[in-house]
């Protein structure tokens, strides 16, 4: 059987028998075919057909920046210079305003400069201290241990305060009370015929006396009348608002709105 198969098999070509005649495929063609199989097809603008395009990835360039490293000594010196510079700028920008007066020496008033005829003029001391405190209200300043304020108003005697503030006010009140009392006594004497001495034992006259004293204390100036009027309006304001909330609108105003 094997002999018959060998007889009917076609003859082997001489070119296949000779190994030198086998065509060699170049590596360049193999490499292009290999890339063509994995490449992405791109449409041609001429006939609409797709043609393989080989895209070769490019290496990405990485830029490395070198950061200079400072030594601890340089960093500490830089921080100190920055702190000194900041303090310099702060000191240059801050403007300190302090109270200055020729009579204000070492945190107190020099009482020798307030002497008149060998005696201290306490009225001038009170006025100067009032002006200094008013200036401090408008221009506050910080205190320090180097410049202590040792002045105290307790060094001013009590009679100086009374002479400065109480006596002028008391003179006004006493004068007004005397005028009002004399007018009321004359009015009672003209109506009833009771004299001034007899009025001191009368209950009605004593009541008028207390009314006069209270009026003099509460109404010292003409501006006090406006203050009392404002207080009276304020006490009755909420009552007026409450009554206005419950008041019905007039029929004339409602018809005009319609």
From Swiss-Prot:
Q: What induces it?
A: Down-regulated by light.
The organism's place on the tree of life at top rank = Eukaryota
Q: Transit peptide located at which residues?
A: 1-42
Q: How does it sit in the membrane?
A: Multi-pass membrane protein
Tissues expressed in: Expressed in photosynthetically active tissues (at protein level).
What GO biological process terms does the UniProt entry carry, in alphabetical order?
A: photosynthesis; positive regulation of chlorophyll biosynthetic process; positive regulation of phytol biosynthetic process; positive regulation of vitamin E biosynthetic process
Knockout-associated phenotype: No visible phenotype under normal growth conditions, but the double mutant plants lli3:1 and lli3:2 are dwarf with yellowish green leaves.
Provide a GO CC annotation, any one: thylakoid light-harvesting complex
| Keyword annotations | Chlorophyll, Chloroplast, Chromophore, Membrane, Photosynthesis, Photosystem II, Plastid, Thylakoid, Transit peptide, Transmembrane, Transmembrane helix
The record gives the effect of mutating residue 189 to A as: Decreases interaction with GGR
Main location (coarse class): plastid
Compartments where located:
Plastid, Chloroplast thylakoid membrane
Which residue ranges does the record annotate as region Disordered?
A: 66-92
TM ranges are 177-197, 199-219
What GO MF terms are annotated?
chlorophyll binding; enzyme binding; identical protein binding; protein-membrane adaptor activity
> What quaternary arrangement does the UniProt entry report?
Interacts with GGR. Forms homodimer and heterodimer with LIL3.1.
Q: What does this protein do?
A: Light-harvesting-like protein required for biosynthesis of phytylated chlorophylls and alpha-tocopherol in green seedlings. Functions by anchoring geranylgeranyl reductase (GGR) in the thylakoid membrane, leading to the stabilization of GGR activity. Binds chlorophyll a in the thylakoid membrane. Plays a role in the regulation of chlorophyll biosynthesis under light stress and under standard growth conditions.
> Which named protein is this?
Light-harvesting complex-like protein 3 isotype 2, chloroplastic
- Origin organism is Arabidopsis thaliana
